[in-house]
Amino acid sequence: MPSPCESGKTTNCSGAPSSSCAKSVECCKKQLSVGVLQQVSASSSGAIVTSLFMTPLDVVKIRLQQQTRPFPKGECFYYHNGLMEHVCVSCEVRKPCEWYQRPGNFRGTADAIVKIARHEGIRSLWSGLSPTMVMALPATVFYFTTYDNLSVWLKKKMCCRRAFSPEKWTPPDWSAAAVAGIVARTIAVTVVSPIEMIRTKMQSKRLTYHEIGHLVRSSMATKGISSFYLGWTPTMLRDIPFSGIYWAGYDLFKTNLQRRQGPDHNPFVVSFVSGAAAGVVASIFTHPFDVIKTNCQIRIGGSIDDMNKSITTVIKDMYHSRGISAFSSGLVPRLVKVSPSCAIMISFYEYFKFLFQKNH
C-alpha cells in the first residue's frame, strides 16, 4: 500500500490547506535533478580537477621529506592526490627513475616547484598521479554518487513526514546529509580496502600477477578475509566521523549561504566556501582519529608485535610517549591539505551537475 508521499494523492493531506497540500505532494515527488550517468561524469570531472590542483603540493612535500631524511628501503610513506591517501613503500632496489628519490637542492616549497618544473619538466609535478588515480577515481565516483542518491532519498522522506505528519518530530535535513555521508563512506572504504592492499603489495615487492594470486590465496588461508582489511578499522575510525561532520556542515553552510544571497546566488562560490568551511570543521574535530590512523598504518611492514598491536594499545603508547599533544600534531598541515581539497572537489562536482542540469 503506497504512502501518501509515494502516491502523491492530495486526498491524504488530512484537512491541510490546498496550497500546503500541493507543496507537500511536490516535495514528496522530488527526484534527483540529474541522472546517475551525469553524476558519474560530474564526480569524475571534479576528481580530475582536484587531483590536478592538489597533487603538486604533495609531490613537493614528499621530495622535501626525502631530501631531509631519505626513505630507507621498505619504509612506508603517504602520497595524497587530493582525493585519498595511498600507502606507498620505498622500493627495495633503489633506482634513479623513482620520482621521490631524484636528487634536488630545494630551499622551500616555492623553490622546489620552480626547480622541479625547470629541470625535470612540468609533468614531474604530477609524478605518481596515474597509478593512484586508478584507485582514487572509481572510489570518489562511487562515494559521491552513493551519497547524492541516498541524501536526496532521505531528505524526501523527511519532507514527506513533515508535510503529512506535522505532529511528529522529524530530524533536520543536515542529519540526512550526515547519515548519507557515513553510509556512502563506509561502503566505499569497504570496497576499496582490499584492492588498495593488493596494489600496495604489488608496488612494494614488484610482484607479478601470478605471485599476487598466490599471495591472495595464502592470506585467505591464514587469516581469512580480514587479511585484506588490516587498515580498515583505523581508517573508518577517522572517515566515519569526518564524513558525518563534513556533509552535515556542508549542508548547513550551503543552505544558510543560499538563503542569505537569495535566488541570484553563485552556486560555484557557495559550494566552494561551504566545502572549505565544512572541511575545516570536520578536520579539527576528527584530527585525533587521523593521528591514530596514521600511527596504526605505519606499523604495516614493521615487526610482528607492532603489526598485531590493537588500536587501544596504539593510543596508550602515543599518550605515554608524548602526552595529550600527540593527538594534535600535524593539525595545521592537514587543514592546509584537506580544506582546499574539499572545496575544489565539491564545488566542481556541484558546478558540473549544474551544467548537466541546465543542458538537460
Curated annotation (Swiss-Prot):
Protein name per Swiss-Prot or TrEMBL: Uncharacterized mitochondrial carrier C16C10.1
Entry keyword annotation includes Coiled coil: no
Broad class of where this protein is predominantly found: mitochondrion
A Pfam short name: Mito_carr
Species whose genome carries this gene: Caenorhabditis elegans
Protein family per UniProt: Belongs to the mitochondrial carrier (TC 2.A.29) family.
GO biological process: import into the mitochondrion
Keyword entries, A-Z: Membrane, Mitochondrion, Mitochondrion inner membrane, Repeat, Transmembrane, Transmembrane helix, Transport
Record Gene3D superfamilies: Mitochondrial carrier domain
Location within or outside the cell: Mitochondrion inner membrane
Bilayer topology annotation: Multi-pass membrane protein
PANTHER family, sorted: FI19922P1-RELATED
Lineage per the UniProt record: Eukaryota, Metazoa, Ecdysozoa, Nematoda, Chromadorea
Ranges for the Solcar repeats: 34-153, 172-256, 266-355
Transmembrane portions of the chain: 40-60, 125-145, 178-198, 225-247, 269-289, 327-348
Gene Ontology CC terms: mitochondrial inner membrane; mitochondrion
InterPro entries per the UniProt record, alphabetical: Mitochondrial_sb/sol_carrier, Mt_carrier_dom_sf, Mtm1-like
